[in-house]
């Protein structure tokens, strides 16, 4: 079993969504997501950001995670929701007939170890001019402390948005970024 998948299968058992809702809404506003946009929530965990995406788009939102336990938790958190579609998938292997306007990675990006593969897959499933939003609800410094002690097969140290965006330059332009004491954000636009 993939080490990341195994880690999150175990972590899901005690995982609680306790993010700052006002920060989530701010990040979504900054991302530019609007009504009728098709959004894929990648590495959704138990779905902390998914209902807020739906509040903006008013179209069903698909959310994927590599962990079956996380997806089960998301379905428990949002029962009987036809608007929030939670499915277990490895993003690198994800295939869909739908092309998305936005891919959002919220609190998940450090666990995607192959950024070049991430960039290629994002290019494949985004519409022309689609956007890749990479965000974390804590600063890069806090994230580094949070992930201290994690195996490098599970998480990686992320650089500044400028440094990280270089891996995406074949397919994307860095449109907007933030790296402050509150949150981390990269918005990349597909060329």
Roles of regions detected by a PLM:
Residues 1-32, 36-43, 133-156:
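Conserved class I S-adenosyl-L-methionine
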Residues 46-92:
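Class I SAM-dependent methyltransferase SAM/SAH-binding core
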Residues 95-102:
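A short acidic, Gly/Pro-enriched loop at the edge of an enzyme's catalytic core
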Residues 102-114:
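A short SAM/SAH-binding and catalytic strip from SAM-dependent methyltransferases
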Residues 117-128:
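A short glycine-rich, Lys/Arg-flanked "PGG" loop and its adjoining helix->strand segment in the class I
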Residues 156-171:
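Short alpha-helix
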